[in-house]
Amino acid sequence: MKETGIHNKAASISTSGLKELSAVFYNLGPARLYEETIRRGEAELSAQGALVARTGQHTGRSPKDKFVVRDANTEDHVWWDNNKPMTPEAFELLYADFIEHAKGRELFVQDLIGGADADNKINARVITEYAWHSLFIRNLLIRPSQEALASYVPEMTIIDLPSFKADPERYGVRTETVIAVDLTRKIVLIGGTSYAGEMKKSVFTALNYILPAKGVMPMHCSANEGPNGDTAVFFGLSGTGKTTLSADPTRTLIGDDEHGWGEHGVFNFEGGCYAKTIRLSAEAEPEIYATTQRFGTVLENVVLDENRQPDFDDGSLTENTRCAYPLDFIPNASKSGKGGQPKNIIMLTADAFGVMPPIAKLTPAQAMYHFLSGYTAKVAATEKGVTEPEATFSTCFGAPFMPRHPSEYGNLLRKLIAEHKVDCWLVNTGWTGGAYGVGKRMPIKATRALLAAALDGSLNNAEFRIDPNFGFAVPVEVPGVESSILDPRSTWADKVAYDAQAKKLVDMFVSNFEKFESHVDHEVKDAAPAIRMAAE
């Protein structure tokens, strides 16, 4: 077996049971991985030098094909309502078949780190069948120094073999695609999908399981730091503006997607970014756009024209087109991946019902309530071609990656907020003056002005009113922001219609929260929205 590249000889790939391979490439850099990718016909080059790969039928994650091993260790610690169980026997059989399937193949190994905090990191070894997958994950996670590689010992291993097709009957799985996670042994097996995001989220899932037991809060969020060292954390589901609002030229970007919060402050889990590129433009997002124009970046499912120019407006393969690049491709990115204790937490929502104010201040109990709710509303087309808002609740702003019960994360968040006296804000980037179709999108200029006032501390001095439906505090006046948009009801021409829409949304919140009622105390229950009909 031919082995190439720097690695710890005492912790070679054979420690994972992988033997009789034709070749193993350890820790290759971008140039070598480009050469191997092209040699193997896995991807092509854009005119600017980015590596462009297609993932075939899977252009997103396969959450319905993800399984967690249910054993004595995980039995009482995993939220089984949200995680599909796999028996240890089925996993063992699958693992043996993965090892058999790998025989005679060339494999690529990247020895990487999840977590920029030395006390709360995991050494994650990622073994891939595809060379471009090796570059992808090298871009996304934290890369150890060349010296550190010689003594690197993996604590977690991911084996990604897209050509492996799972037999549903043999392993008790759903389809030919499988993502099997053994949290006890820290092994992840990915088969039957070429979508690279599965690898990144497997490390996130492992850290989301490991860290709460150490009192560290794992978060699906972006984070940045102001010139005075004040750290801000941004929670939000897809389409709420998390990436756009945290990419602020006046602040240092700590990371765009996954972070931990512990005794030393906030730290990035990753060493790169995985940004959406559909309709990306140099005007709207210059920093992200610039990364797509250079050597080392991986473009996933981006369409190239005949001159190999990327067409970011073309969603014919998928709307979920992406680019993966190291964090240092962004000019104002943090070199350490670490920030201090957060001064502000921003929970983003895009309320397409037009009911919520553009900003509200939350108490720690309200912050826990809204964190557990994880609300946004997207606009979905109905069969008649009419579009209407659809509420989405994804607990902890990232339900698919949370192995433990949401209340564990919620209680930890609430404790840290109280301990560090963090200001919490709910920011609505959705609609004002009516629901989608009647009202208009919240002006980004207003959102940025409100956010700036929250982050610099001046918003704390504003006069606040209590929202009659949601019970949170809403500023009455903010310099540079039209006062009318601060009171959503006043922006609706039809006040009765607003009250009806507000009642509808409040009822959705209440109904969604029923499953958490028995896991929270009275203070959090009392933070629930309730209809108190406003006077004309």
From Swiss-Prot:
Involved in the gluconeogenesis. Catalyzes the conversion of oxaloacetate (OAA) to phosphoenolpyruvate (PEP) through direct phosphoryl transfer between the nucleoside triphosphate and OAA. CDD domains: PEPCK_ATP. Keywords: ATP-binding, Cytoplasm, Decarboxylase, Gluconeogenesis, Lyase, Manganese, Metal-binding, Nucleotide-binding. InterPro entries: PEP_carboxykinase_ATP (IPR001272), PEP_carboxykinase_C (IPR013035), PEP_carboxykinase_N (IPR008210), PEPCK_ATP_CS (IPR015994). Coiled coil: none annotated. SUPFAM superfamilies: PEP carboxykinase N-terminal domain (SSF68923), PEP carboxykinase-like (SSF53795). It is found in: Cytoplasm. It holds the Pfam family PEPCK_ATP. Substrate binds at R61, Y195, K201, R322. This is Phosphoenolpyruvate carboxykinase (ATP). Its EC number is 4.1.1.49. One of its GO terms (biological process) is gluconeogenesis. GO terms for cellular component: cytosol. Its cofactor is Mn(2+). The gene is pckA. Belongs to the phosphoenolpyruvate carboxykinase (ATP) family. ATP binds at K201, H220, G236, L237, S238, G239, T240, G241, K242, T243, T244, E285, R322, T447. Pathway: Carbohydrate biosynthesis; gluconeogenesis.
